[in-house]
């Protein structure tokens, strides 16, 4: 329990930030899930659209400080690699 007015305010601010961060993180998870589903279906057009959407969502999360920029970069890189794998297999 906060003892001072400033501690109460910091608690309110932390709760607001946490709610916002949870919302952003949920959006990232949803975008990644949609991309993985598109990859599993094997449709290149859907996969590319989902990849673009996921990259945008992850980039925004990194710019807001919800994800570390290196973690976001790593996540985007791995998703792009996973999205490219079926296309490369189809080209062979």
From Swiss-Prot:
Positions of the UniProt region annotated as Disordered: 1-28
UniProt keyword terms in alphabetical order: Ribonucleoprotein, Ribosomal protein, RNA-binding, rRNA-binding
Gene Ontology, cellular component aspect: cytosol; small ribosomal subunit
Residue pairs linked by disulfide bridges in the UniProt entry: none
GO molecular function, one term: structural constituent of ribosome
UniProt-listed GO biological process terms: translation
SUPFAM superfamilies: Ribosomal protein S20
Family of this protein: Belongs to the bacterial ribosomal protein bS20 family.
Its job: Binds directly to 16S ribosomal RNA.
HAMAP family registered for this protein in UniProt: Ribosomal_bS20
Name listed for the protein in its UniProt record: Small ribosomal subunit protein bS20
This protein's encoding gene: rpsT
